[in-house]
């Protein structure tokens, strides 16, 4: 193991606090260094053991660590140190506690293009640091653009789980990222490059200005088709207050050929980001983003996330109940013990926290069960955070009967 991986018990040096979030095979918790009292975010990544399918591959964990070690920029999250245990690798990261940029903007009553372009500039400056180090992020989206703290407008790029070093000689082809933000070359399984990130910047900018996602379809296939066909426009109702400079900035990123797409340096020197004439600065200052539609976009996004999680909880609960019936018919000798186990499991699912190992039953692949649960658990975690944010008492089990106010459909 790399000598920079610390092997002593993590708790010897840190006090572990509340959960900050969860993802695939990982959970992030706030921690306090015992001596310095400095706060960090600790990312606990479960290691894949042997031939199992639960946990992250060690090579992927090391890849993420190596990328983070190259990072040293005000707009990119920094890695403090790494611990290795038998079950987990723990990344001690800079604490970023200001929430998502888009959530911050949705709380404002108005936002000029001048302010919007300042946020995009910070994203570009962080991205330039990556690209100068030949690193492509591959998962740029609003959820991975955070504010340092609640009193700051400093942006931090986070989540380098898909990031990798890349150069012109590499022929990297991979289907990765979040559908509505991925570039045409990802959909077509063509070589990826630094330009792949730039397409995502275009999507983020489009949404920020209009409150609408340019390529999102009713289905995944429709979204992919819209991306590869460049099926987007600047709808008058959405962009009537948008400057031509901003539209030009986006159009230079929505180019199918990656070699012709605007680079991070091109974008930083674009007049929408860096005005060279007074009229360009005035155009930015007088134009406004579509804040009403942006608020509606964020409300719809939260609604869809919430309803998806409620649906997943219901499906998982029904699945467990069905397995209980199957177990009863297949083995009356173990009826009592299995019923106790399943009742505990069902209770945990309703609370949004469950153990994948407790879902096994005859005729099912436990490894496959755990993969499904790992993917769905992060959605449940998001729902719990939103539930807390709305100041509702109780747990997720209540939403299965009567959805709280934040689950009411947006207008």
Model regions and ranges:
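Protein kinase glycine-rich loop
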Residues: 16-24, 28
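Conserved N-lobe beta3->alphaC-helix segment of eukaryotic protein kinase catalytic domains
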Residues: 44-71
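A short, aromatic-enriched beta-strand patch in the conserved N-lobe beta-sheet
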Residues: 81-82
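Glycine-rich ATP phosphate-binding loop
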Residues: 27-49
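C-terminal regulatory tails of eukaryotic serine/threonine kinases
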Residues: 265-350, 354
